[in-house]
């Protein structure tokens, strides 16, 4: 699989998805298309499929965790490390834990409401899409040392802090 189908979901259920194909170097192959997510199904055959999720539905965090070994123990520790910073009950949230940077105790985490995740899963299951990866829009904004990076996209301002990677 040298090409990747990138599908961007919108915050509004009524808004169409948009997608494009990129080659192994990240160069666009063709134009951005939009419509119902099912329309992207034919393009997913033989390609890696990546979803870009609305930043408004995904909270990104980097909690400092004590040295804990094993994915299961880390998954148990993360919600409690973030509990006081979240407005929702922990059982209503899904926590996707990234890889710890060897030079830090911070652990990248993406948090999404379980109901929202289930809605997305139903949408891509109904369309026959099998994603290989999913990223929050805001996690795709590049960072720069000692500077904020701001991206204005269709009325939404995305911000990448200097310490965000």
Placement of each model-derived feature along the sequence:
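Hydrophobic/aromatic-enriched cytosolic interaction surfaces used to assemble or bind macromolecules
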Residues: 1-165
